[in-house]
Amino acid sequence: MTFDALLLLSFGGPEGPEQVMPFLENVTRGRGIPRERLESVAEHYLHFGGVSPINGINRDLITAIEAELSRRGMQLPVYFGNRNWEPFVEDTVAAMRDNGIRRAAVFSTSAWGGYSGCTQYQEDIARGRNAAGPDAPELVKLRQYFDHPLLVEMFADAIADARDTLPEPLRADARLVFTAHSIPLRAASRCGPDLYERQVGYAAGLVAGAAGYRDYDQVWQSRSGPPQVPWLEPDVGDHLAALAEAGTKAVIVCPIGFVSDHIEVVWDLDSELAEQAAEAGVALARASTPNAQPRFAQLAVDLIDEVIAGRPPQRVPGENPVPGYGSSVNGALCTELCGA
């Protein structure tokens, strides 16, 4: 299989105060979220001038991917499309069509399976192609990459860097806590039994081992919606409170569920959780995400090369008890389980 282009597909985010509410309305469309709740969330963005870091990080990642493609002698233009804000995926796919692109690889900024981590991106692809009409390019979503060696390496290195920011006497006993985005239990049951949770748990174990930790915790963050709807638990804030009560003096939090330092990292962890830790007398260090590292660009191009060359997926050696689904075409589901 060959490709004419690469599409980086992401979530999107506002880039000015006037964009915050329209963006949040796009994100929550059809979910009946009260406006007062949206206004409360909007304050998180307005704290940073109404600008989410995600689009800037993705543009930097595209630059890094272009450099990696050039280094490998692969002449592929890189396009950028989002689900919830400009550049919208529908507009990007139309531009690809107009530029004569016939088949493109799609790299999404989610390493995971499950509805939120994978299926929604398949829906984005299908929606973009439908909007572009019969001459839309074929779009091949690249595989889930939660167990790619470079992802594990980047997070392990980030943990070491975060540990070094703690006061030296606290480093040895600092508790390592992995966190990922919580989802409703109903959503967690789609795409196979507990697929998302199992992938996150497996990846956390790989990263902990690579970072030299045998003991660690894995929790969830950033839940939303009505309190009567059950979501994955424990919450990172509740877990931090329990650690503080048990006498823990230092915590390293690794946001393994995210590939960039977007608003749910810089607000939920760097602001809210950091404030909670300070009040509890716990030293908190947050590991960085891959963002636009050259290694993350290398990972993206590795996935393209796997498809072009028909190579087996690069995975951390050893037995993997957790499924990770491969590439799929034009928004088709990676597994029929996601249609259940």
UniProtKB/Swiss-Prot annotation:
UniProt subcellular location: Cytoplasm
Binding site for Fe-coproporphyrin III: 52, 121
Enzyme Commission code: 4.99.1.9
Pathways involved: Porphyrin-containing compound metabolism; protoheme biosynthesis
Molecular function terms, GO-annotated: ferrochelatase activity; metal ion binding
Catalytic reaction annotation: Fe-coproporphyrin III + 2 H(+) = coproporphyrin III + Fe(2+)
Keyword Isomerase applies: no
InterPro entries according to UniProt: Ferrochelatase, Ferrochelatase_AS, Ferrochelatase_C, Ferrochelatase_N
Similarity field: Belongs to the ferrochelatase family.
Function according to Swiss-Prot or TrEMBL: Involved in coproporphyrin-dependent heme b biosynthesis. Catalyzes the insertion of ferrous iron into coproporphyrin III to form Fe-coproporphyrin III.
Protein name, entry field: Coproporphyrin III ferrochelatase
